[in-house]
């Protein structure tokens, strides 16, 4: 296998669900570099990400608390080794005390939490005592603690299974709209819990990330088109770009000119171009911002009205309520996200946290 071990091929297959021979070929191409092999398979349209959720997991809870005046909110991810322990009354009490300590000492990170006092001793000692009593490693892995300035509210949503939580902050101008803004924030938080946007806005992406994702996206669409062609179905447009951050004024002006030249060649009278070109530009932007539509909160289509993006929903509410709304905060925790469900890895993370 050209120096590529069977174990490495199996690991790549577990991570991507690609075929065994495809995994072997990818590893040979990149001299055994696992991350490069994953990227290679994605760019070839051979990686199936659907299994990811089954592989990356840890037990415990995501818990949040929103202040009654919607001016502050806390969210925490606490991991245990088994879901059985996560349902234990002692574990539930630990979650309660964690939130109380975060609130009392204005804590924003797990490191700050461990050093903070609880019942006249460091929280770290309390956590060690609970680990001894409960009999499993327990890790306070993530903390979000948001506070709203004037003319802002914060609301959130925690899924009933305690595995997903979201906090949303919205700025507004008209105080009479506060109750409606609170409800809107909760509805958007529910959307985010289900649809898993990675970031708030495309501006949060790096250009390198967008270029890499665009290559994978093009490979995916080309593969879908092969199947569509075989079945006699309409083909999807192949994008040139993936995100709005790539669509500069120059790019848009060039595309507008291309559409005008196209209409001229078709013999369409110039006086009707302004009725045709805007629709073509809208379609061009939609086809070339697919990464935003998949991965950004503002770019996703709203689950309660799939004809509108979240950005359009916020804009429509601004117009309807005579206000100027803006989503300013977005935090989403999903239990175990980024942790492989392997005891040794979890133990290492706990050990690092306890140092």
UniProtKB/Swiss-Prot annotation:
Function: Associates with the EF-Tu.GDP complex and induces the exchange of GDP to GTP. It remains bound to the aminoacyl-tRNA.EF-Tu.GTP complex up to the GTP hydrolysis stage on the ribosome.
A Pfam family it matches: EF_TS
Coiled coil: none
Subcellular location as annotated: Cytoplasm
MF-aspect GO terms: translation elongation factor activity
SUPFAM superfamilies linked to this entry: Elongation factor Ts (EF-Ts), dimerisation domain, UBA-like
Sequence segments annotated as region (Involved in Mg(2+) ion dislocation from EF-Tu): 82-85
CDD domains membership: UBA_EF-Ts (cd14275)
Keywords: Cytoplasm, Elongation factor, Protein biosynthesis
Protein name: Elongation factor Ts
Annotated family: Belongs to the EF-Ts family.
Cross-referenced NCBIfam families: tsf
Gene Ontology cellular component list: cytoplasm
């Amino acid at each position: 296998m050209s120096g590529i071990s069977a174990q490495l091929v199996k690991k790549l297959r577990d991570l991507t669900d690609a075929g065994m021979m495809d995994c072997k070929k990818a590893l040979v191409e990149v001299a055994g570099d696992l991350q490069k092999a994953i990227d290679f398979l994605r760019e070839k349209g051979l990686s199936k990400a659907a299994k990811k959720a089954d592989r990356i997991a840890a037990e415990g809870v995501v818990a949040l608390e929103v202040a009654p005046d919607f001016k502050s909110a806390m969210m925490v991810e606490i991991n245990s080794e088994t879901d059985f322990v996560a349902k234990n009354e002692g574990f539930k009490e630990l979650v309660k005390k964690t939130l109380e300590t975060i609130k009392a000492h204005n804590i924003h990170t797990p490191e700050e939490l461990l050093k903070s006092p609880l019942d006249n001793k460091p929280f770290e000692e309390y956590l060690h005592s609970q680990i001894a009593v409960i009999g499993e490693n327990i890790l306070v892995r993530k903390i979000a603690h948001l506070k709203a300035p004037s003319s802002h509210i914060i609301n959130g949503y925690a899924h009933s299974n305690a595995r997903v939580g979201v906090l949303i902050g919205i700025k507004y101008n008209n105080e009479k709209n506060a109750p409606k803004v609170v409800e809107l924030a909760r509805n958007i938080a529910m959307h985010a819990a289900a649809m898993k946007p990675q970031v708030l806005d495309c501006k949060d992406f790096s250009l390198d990330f967008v270029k890499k994702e665009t290559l994978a996206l093009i490979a995916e669409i080309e593969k879908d088109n092969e199947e569509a062609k075989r079945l006699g179905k309409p083909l999807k447009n192949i994008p040139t770009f993936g995100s709005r951050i790539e669509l500069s004024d120059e790019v848009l002006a060039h595309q507008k000119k291309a559409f005008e030249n196209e209409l001229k060649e078709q013999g369409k009278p110039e006086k009707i171009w302004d009725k045709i070109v805007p629709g073509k530009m809208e379609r061009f932007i939609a086809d070339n911002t697919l990464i935003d539509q998949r991965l950004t909160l503002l770019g996703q289509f709203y689950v309660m009205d799939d004809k509108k993006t979240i950005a359009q929903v916020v804009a429509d509410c601004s117009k309807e309520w005579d206000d100027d709304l803006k989503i300013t905060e977005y935090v989403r925790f999903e239990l175990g996200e980024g942790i492989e469900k392997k005891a040794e890895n979890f133990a290492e993370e706990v050990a690092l946290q306890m140092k």
